[in-house]
Amino acid sequence: EASGGAVHAAPRTLCDQRFVGRLIWCHDPEGNRLEFFCDPEIATEPFTPGRAISGFKTGPFGMGHAVVKTPNVETLVPFYRDVLGFRVSDYALSPIPLFFFHVNDRHHSFAMVGSEARGLHHLMLEYCSLDDVGQGYDLAQLQEGRISQTLGRHTNDYMTSFYTHTPSGFFIESGHGGRLIDMDTWEPHETDCGPSFWGHERLYLSAEQRDTFRDMRLTLARDGKRAPDCPWFQAVTGAR
């Protein structure tokens, strides 16, 4: 409210639908609805997955991450950084604007990508086992057109993942091995190497756009760039 935005208290009916004690909501400058809650109801029954998996990495790291697409990155960054208090992890300006934010030790829990469109780009869920991701990839490939980005590994958070289309028009990223950082010592910085070491072929883009991302991956391969063998050592030494 101090920044000029309207904040609304949710009625009891909505709190009951969300299974939370209290809830407030507002819109970001792009009109995306944000909900904040406390006192969630805790399930007493153990989680039963839809297929045999080892589980999801959540707890103190949250559920994963969410990414929105926007034509006005410069408008959204101050809101999430200065109003909500999210901390910038890193950012890229080319070939498209990308900003990543952390709120805990997960490299990023929120991000935004420059786009002509607005709305949700994707949600990421992190599995406890790489085999969970690989087996899910096999299953997704049984459905024609389901894969939106092939299996690959990201350069900033080291996540090995693939992306799938959803009926609602956004993507789901299924990943493993995401990077943890030290919030007290981390310094935000610009990256220019591209989003992936290998893979993540964006099947939904034009041939020209795909060539741009592929050239960046091939440059990394030529230069011998890869994720560190020991992310913990990298974290404590401050190397990137």
Task: List where the protein language model places each region.
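Structured, non-catalytic alpha/beta "coupling" segments that mediate domain-domain communication
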Residues: D28-C38
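Generic structural signal for well-ordered beta-strand positions
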Residues: L34, S89, I172-E173
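Surface-exposed beta-loop interaction hotspot
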Residues: D28, I42-V73
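Core segments of cupin and vicinal oxygen chelate
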Residues: V68-H108, V113
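Vicinal oxygen chelate
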Residues: E1-E30, T70-E74, L125-R240
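Intrinsic, low-complexity N-terminal interaction/targeting segments
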Residues: R12-T13, N32, T44, H108-A111, ...
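Long C-terminal interaction/binding lobes of large macromolecular proteins
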Residues: A117
